[in-house]
Amino acid sequence: MERELWDEIVVDNFAGGGGASTGIKMAIGRDVDIAINHDPAAIAMHKANHPYTEHYNESVWDIDPVTATGGRPVGLCWFSPDCKHFSKAKGGKPVDKNIRGLAWVALKWAATVRPRVIMLENVEEFKTWGPLLGDRPDPNQKGRTFNCFVNALRRHGYQVDWRELRACDYGAPTIRKRFFLIARCDGRPIVWAKPTHGEA
């Protein structure tokens, strides 16, 4: 995938200050091409960390993928939507349907510019994404919206797989577990990196 990404563009949605973009750069050897974030302070930090990236200080929903990419093929589209309204760390606090629904923007990209690979990272509870009862997740419909999201990607011709991974198994100094989803439409298999640290 690395060689092909020199001929395709890489897009980081919900780019924040550039953590995911830095990881992508470490993996593929170059900066991401486009970074999108609604927060001016986050985009300012991203610009400082990734000065060669094209920046959009807008809501991910306000970006037209066709215009932003300018007809260039998209090799990788990365999504790290706000996780606070899924995380168990939030406790019993109310959740916001609009924030929980941010991941749907991945379908907008899939439908308009068809990235070869889509990756999404979030808290492990993301796979329990379901409808709300008032301002709380409906305990009887855990995972229903997540399944709809996955099926929508599949209807767009994507093969989809997901896993929960621990950062410490890949050399990061934290034991937290994160959810990762990979979707690809190029007919090639989804391959997960093998752990590099810890017990075999």
Q: What are the language-model segments listed below?
A:
Residues 1-8:
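Class I SAM-dependent methyltransferase Rossmann-like catalytic core
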Residues 4, 47, 54, 67-68, ...:
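A general structural signal for stabilizing positions within well-ordered secondary structure
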Residues 6, 29-31, 158, 177:
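Residue-level signal for beta-strand positions within conserved beta-sheet cores that form or flank
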Residues 8-62:
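SAM cofactor-binding core of SAM-dependent methyltransferases
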Residues 15-16, 79-83:
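Glycine-rich His-Gly loop
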Residues 35, 54-56, 76-80, 87:
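Short, conserved beta-strand segments within well-ordered enzyme catalytic domains
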